[in-house]
Amino acid sequence: MPHPVDMVVDTGDKGDLWMDAIEAEKRGDREDSLRICRELVIGEPDNSDAWMMIARMELPAPTKGKQEMPSLVQTAKSVTALKKVVQLDPENRRAWDLGGTLLVDHLGMMEDALTWWEERREHAPAEVTPLIEQVSILVRMGYYEECADLIEEMFSPEMETVDGGLRMRMGRVSQTVSKASK
């Protein structure tokens, strides 16, 4: 068993690694930040923040405010890290949103994306976003009839209150399904 002093130093080293990763990101050195976070999760596999940084650093850096399209390899690596993030921190909405976007828009994995959002619903049953995403995916797949139950649930009183923008999106999704199913 390690000496208690060694354990304290160990914790400090991990904290130092995390600070180094943040500093590398601030400097714009994504590769160094990625390398440090990979090293960090080897010793601290339950560090959801480090996994989230890995997921972000695997993707191309935005240039002039626009996100460059990631390669399949970059996307797959990012999704793998995001799966770890949501496993460790199921309340990390940013990870859920990014993972859903990557699965649908960059990998075209519609079935996996449906499962992804269903898992989110298990953790946040009153959240509307997973339902909207599932309906949108089903519409893209042409499964309009399957959308009806989800839309009904989306507008049920048990669901969280949403802001105007999300309410408009819910209405658009509902209208799209209604028109397409006729």
Per-segment meaning from a language model:
Residues 11, 45, 90, 125, ...:
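Short coil turns that delineate tetratricopeptide repeat
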Residues 13-43, 59, 63-68:
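Alpha-helical segment of the N-proximal tetratricopeptide repeat
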Residues 27-35, 62-84, 106-119, 142-149:
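Structural signature of tandem alpha-helical TPR/SEL1-like repeats
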Residues 50, 95, 130, 163-164:
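TPR alpha-solenoid repeat register
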Residues 22, 56, 63, 101-102, ...:
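Residue-level recognition of tetratricopeptide repeat
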Residues 2-16:
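TPR-adjacent "capping" and linker segments in tetratricopeptide-repeat scaffold/adaptor proteins
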